[in-house]
């Protein structure tokens, strides 16, 4: 082989080897890119629903940049799936209640700009709990606080803060309302906000920050709602509303709302005679409410709401240790599970209870005559046995030397069960404390516990003599 042939042969071999190497490099690059995208690939969305990506879980759309052999490849990672809540887990088994939160609003008002409020409540989204209240359009150390004992004025708004944050000047005013309810369906907040003339009020339905629907007064006599959280199951929320006499026959309706739009309205049925200010909780697949009979009974009405067919039933808590105020002494109070007991039915106070098998957990003022003190306990057979009075696990939340007020329930979903929590409104000022011209409140919050617990009292704690008049 002459020199030229040798050079040509060596060149051909080198070119072949270079070509093979280039093809291998391209194959490796293609394989790497394919594997990378498959690792983060989203399944095809069904019904325009966003599906989760694995193994990366994020809350917002971001762009991931991957560098491979100096080549930049951009691929959008799918957002985390957001689902409606269904509350299908069992109820937590508890031994009692433990302290959770206290906002000290009145004490702080002695030296700071804190809203005048009443009708507080608590509700949680899937990640965080919030406190709500109806503001009076003024701070406490402000001449506008004079006369805030009145319930319904056009300046009242629904306030919303993270639980434990008092209603300071930076607090968001969610809507215009002198009666309200709020709940989170897993995707967004629903607020039911009632305001307007006593004889022709309007309820606005605000979902995800937008007004979606409304309804006007149907009995022209103070349309009103729960003053605590509503409940949403699989995207449908339900709220109890009443229009009519506060001390006689009224027209109660149960509304079903989907993403802010009213989809159905059911009339009250069953044996309950008067319904106001219900405290509702999920009892999958349905919803149960414990309410206030402001007409005939000091035993509390129960509403069972079927979320599938919109049917309604009602009755009364069986416990002979009744939950409303005013009420008879425990030795003479009664309840037959079906009817109001006709014992000091008027006026009443918002309260709560929840079933635990055949038993019932409940809270009430310690005083049988006024809104002072607060206690909780379980009544054995209190959900199933008429006039049951066997009380266990009693706790004092506020001693009887201090004022309480409204109370209500809210539910918190844990890893394995749904816990029941409650708040107590701690009212200060008028009508009981006439040294000042205002009426406002703070709150204390407890949640169910399966552990042990001690004793104490958690009143508002403000010295009325330190407060602005």
From Swiss-Prot:
Binding site for Ca(2+): 293, 297, 324
UniProt KW keywords: Calcium, Disulfide bond, Glycoprotein, Glycosidase, Host cell membrane, Host membrane, Hydrolase, Membrane, Metal-binding, Signal-anchor, Transmembrane, Transmembrane helix, Virion
Catalytic activity: Hydrolysis of alpha-(2->3)-, alpha-(2->6)-, alpha-(2->8)- glycosidic linkages of terminal sialic acid residues in oligosaccharides, glycoproteins, glycolipids, colominic acid and synthetic substrates
Molecular function GO terms recorded: exo-alpha-sialidase activity; metal ion binding
UniProt name for this protein: Neuraminidase
GO cellular component: host cell plasma membrane; membrane; virion membrane
Domain remark text: Intact N-terminus is essential for virion morphogenesis. Possesses two apical sorting signals, one in the ectodomain, which is likely to be a glycan, and the other in the transmembrane domain. The transmembrane domain also plays a role in lipid raft association.
Species the sequence originates in: Influenza A virus (strain A/Leningrad/134/17/1957 H2N2)
The protein's Enzyme Commission number: 3.2.1.18
Hypervariable stalk region: annotated span: 36-88
Virion surface topological intervals: 30-469
Listed cofactors: Ca(2+)
Gene transcribed to yield this protein: NA
HAMAP family the UniProt entry points to: INFV_NRAM
Post-translational modification: N-glycosylated.
Note: The influenza A genome consist of 8 RNA segments. Genetic variation of hemagglutinin and/or neuraminidase genes results in the emergence of new influenza strains. The mechanism of variation can be the result of point mutations or the result of genetic reassortment between segments of two different strains.
Xref: InterPro entries: Glyco_hydro_34 (IPR001860), Sialidase_Influenza_A/B (IPR033654), Sialidase_sf (IPR036278)
First-tier enzyme category under EC: hydrolase
